[in-house]
Each structure stands twice: as structure tokens, then as C-alpha cells.
Amino acid sequence: MNQLCVERSPNISTATAYIKGKPKKSIERIKKKKDSNKSIKSQHKFEGSKISNKNNELKDVKSKDPKNYESYLNKNTKHKDILLKSKRSDNFKFSRRGFILSFTGNLEDFYNLSEEPLGKGTYGCVYKATDKLLKIQRAVKVVSKKKLKNIPRFRQEIDIMKNLDHPNVIKLLETFEDEEQIYLIMDLCTGGELFDKIIKKGSFVEMYASFIMKQIFSVLNYLHIRNICHRDIKPENFLFYDKSTESLIKIIDFGLAAYFNDIDYEMKTKAGTPYYVAPQVLTGCYDYKCDLWSAGVLFYIILCGYPPFYGESDHEILSMVKKGKYNFKGKEWNNISDEAKDLIKRCLTIDSGKRINASEALKHPWFKKKKGSFNLDVKMDIHVLENFKNYALLLKLQKLAMTIIAQQSNDYDLQQLKAVFLYLDEDGKGNITKNQLKKGLENSGLKLPQNFDVLLDQIDSDGSGRIDYTEFLAAALDRKHLSKKLIYCAFRVFDVDNDGEITTAELAHVTFFVILFLHHVNDFPRLENCTKYIDLNA
């Protein structure tokens, strides 16, 4: 049975327990009696209200969901807990977000930073960093707290990055914090900025432009489905993962990104870069389609080499943007297809209500004509199906470890799986349906086992109904990629105090937070101050 409990320290009279899909329950601390090392099933059910009685015992406690949950009283030398045990063994779900841990202390105990920064920003610099033990190279964004005008706003940037899981989004791996700085440890991209490539080449042929723009519209579709507006789409904020011709691009810098709600899309903060900013942003009342305007400007630039709106100063540029007038008159446009020009027009529509959205852009005839790829071999072989089967048989703790390994793996080792995932993601939502995966396997000539639907449920580790990028990688990852370095990465996530050993409490630390993040619980103690115990054998 799955088991979740919350420790109450001696100076706290109440604690919070969490049940999957249910609101938090307040429980009064049960005072210690005799210490024991065993867990005893109580004679009563969990009520969810404060527990109080003369004998300090668990009495008259009822379950809110008696069909699925029982309550237990746990006693040992350090604490006493209410245990919430699920009667079902198949509902243990977890999210990769919970593995992106935050640490306090000296970053240089773990990483060697390059002397020269890779890039500079308003609040800090990005350096190349090398893991001292594993020799893995990462990128570290170093942000000065003194220069940050709004630290909560910066923490929202971190929160947004933790929630994103897409092949075209820069991957946040962990964070550090000391008294003066905040450090974001991310994937290292070595291929340079999209901006630099535009400067070097001048313009792109349509086939390559379609390869780039499909990725941009796909990642915008992914963000907008999750009610996130980037608000600073420009070529400087896209990096090539490596220097290869077919390298994917990664969107970076979520410093201006913001959440919007389903009822009122409007945002009011003026944000963006003059060449790429949408007219509505200048008025201080705009919606998520400001990103589509910016994408349209970027699209225009990569086809001809210069922006649609220009001037000698920011004031002149913004004046041109407000008018929204541009043309395709230069000789550079002579050989550009009408379909490409039409897609640009749909992005650069002044009326945001009539402006195309990212999902519609992906279905535009231009992509069908150009196919938007380099004919990558995306067929899955029998080994992928076998890896799925093997993953489904793993213990829950092993699945947690495989998810960490998939997240920590660099894209060099995952090129084929990444191409397969993007191919299967037909609607550009950044995740795939179970039917899309089945169709892809069948189209590759593979015979599916009779219990394949059950197997798919095992791959969908967060229970969302769709298979996310890291979920797919964790299940499809070939065991030959399980290097000692990656295995140690998984070990280090669980080894909270970095003493080279993993205790039951440390396993519970990580697993508890993975569960909390899955259910979007924000009201919980700091990691270093709480100990959670979970039935890890379940």
C-alpha cells in the first residue's frame, strides 16, 4: 500500500497531511507515549479534523474516503505520525519537477566555473561550469541578489522553468543559493545564438527556416497551453544545442515570462524588445498573442536578414511598430513563397483577436509544403518497445531513479529519441497521447503486446493522461546510456546531505516533494527542516 505521513516537530502543535487530489487536512499533534519501532494500525478511520482526547490517543477518527484510504498511527523514537495509506497499489504518481532541487551553500564546492562568462545580462552572467566529481559540463546563471529589483519575481522565473518539460526549452537541473547570489544550473548549449547564425548567414532558405520556425511555434504552443506567455521572443533568446547542422534550438530567459488565466488573458506590464514587441504591449493592455507577433518578426528576419520595423532610434522603431506597416518589396523576397509571406502576415496582424495562434500556425500550408524537417529517421525499433516493457516492470523507486537519469542526460545521447518524440507530437502540444505512441509503434512495424494500455499507464508517471517528454525518455532510454556518471546524478538527488549514503529519511525527503509538486501544493516547510516517511516498498 502507498503510505504518506507528515512529521510534527516538538514545538509544533499542528501539521498538514496531503492526500492525492484532496485539500490539505489539519491534524493536531499526538503527544508521545511509549516509544516503539513498529507501525500500528489504528482501530478508527481518519476524519481530517483536529484530534483531541484526554488520553492523547487516536480516537473517533473517520476517513473522508474510506474506500481508498485508511489511517495509521506510527510510533518510533523521534516522532509520531498519522499515516494515510492508500488501499490501491496503482495510484503512486510523481512529477519530474520534484527532482529539481534547491540547495544552500557554496556552489564552488561542487562546480568549477569558467573565468570568462558565456554571456551577460541585467542581473548577472552565465558561466560554463564543470561538475568537480562527474566532470559533466553545465551552464550556470549567476544572479546577484543586490541587483535584483524584485526577488519574488525572479523566483517566479525559477518556478516557471521547473514546470517546463519540452525538447525546445532549456532544462533547469538544480539551483543553489548563498547570501549574495542565486545560481541556476542548466543544460549547456554550445551551438551559439540564433541571432549569431542570422548575422553570419544573412538569411535562411525556406526549408531551413521551416525547421526553425516549427520549433518556435511548437514551444510557443506548449507555453500558451500552460498559460505562460514568454514576452521576449527574439533570436538572442534561442540557443542551438550544439554546432551540428540539425541541432535543435532551445528557448531561454524566462525573466519576463508571466502566467495568464483562462478567463482574462490580458496583461499590462510593458515588456519586450523594440524590434519584436507587439503594438498592444506598447499600450499596456495585451494578451499571449504578443508572442506570435514577435515570432512573426523573427520569421521575417530569418528569411530576408533585416527587420520589418526599423528606425534610427527606439522611438522611431516603436513608432513603426504602432503603425504595423511593412512590405515584401526587397529583392530578397523575390524567391520567397506566397505561403511563407501569408504566415508572416497572419502573425503580424495588428488586431490580436484576428492574429493567428501557435496551434493554427503549426497547421499552416507552408509547413506542409516545406515539411519543416530534414527527413530525420524517426522509426522506432524493437529495442524501444522492449525498453517500455522493462520500464513497466520496475519498482516505483527505480522509476524515480530512471526519471532523474533521463532528466540529467545530455541531448547528445538522446538525439534519436528526441527526434521520435517530436515526430509523434503531431499537434505540437509538447507531449504525446497514448494513441499517438501506439500509432507510431505500429507504423514502425512493431507488434504491440495485449497489455499495452496497462504499459502506457506505467509510462504516464504523473497521471496526466498524456506522456510528457521526460516520461517518454525515462521509459524509452536504452540501458547502454546508464553510465556511472548518470547513475551518480540520480544518487546525488536522493543524497540530500551529500554524505555519500542514502537514508530512508532522505528517500522520503525527495519522494514527498515529488508528490507535493505533482499536486501543486505550495504550503509546506522548507526541505531542510522536515522529515517525511513514505512506504517506499509500495
UniProtKB/Swiss-Prot annotation:
Residues 56-68 have a biased composition (Basic and acidic residues). Residues 412-447, 450-481, 482-517 form the EF-hand domain. Activated by calcium. Upon calcium binding to the EF-hand domain 2, the C-terminus of the junction domain (J domain) undergoes a conformational change which results in the dissociation of the pseudo-substrate inhibitory motif from the catalytic domain. This, in turn, may facilitate the autophosphorylation of the activation loop at Thr-273, which leads to the kinase activation. Ca(2+) 1 binds at residues 460, 462, 464, 466, 471. Its cofactor is Mg(2+). GO terms for cellular component: cytoplasm. A motif (J domain autoinhibitory motif) lies at residues 387-395. A motif (J domain EF-hand interaction motif) lies at residues 396-405. Residues 387-422 are annotated as: J domain. The active site is at residue 232. Pfam families: EF-hand_5, EF-hand_7, Pkinase. The keyword Nucleus does not apply. Keywords: ATP-binding, Calcium, Cytoplasm, Developmental protein, Differentiation, Kinase, Magnesium, Metal-binding, Nucleotide-binding, Repeat, Serine/threonine-protein kinase, Transferase. Its main location: cytoplasm. Calcium-dependent protein kinase which acts as a sensor and effector of intracellular Ca(2+) levels probably in part downstream of cGMP-activated PKG kinase. In the mosquito midgut, regulates the gliding motility of the ookinete which is essential for the ookinete to invade the midgut epithelium. However, another study showed that while required for ookinete invasion of the midgut epithelium, is not required for ookinete gliding motility. The EF-hand domain 1 cannot bind calcium due to the presence of a Lys instead of an Asp at position 429 and a Gln instead of a Glu at position 436 preventing calcium binding. The EF-hand domains 3 probably binds calcium constitutively when calcium levels are low, while the EF-hand domain 2 binds calcium following an increase in calcium levels. This is Calcium-dependent protein kinase 3.
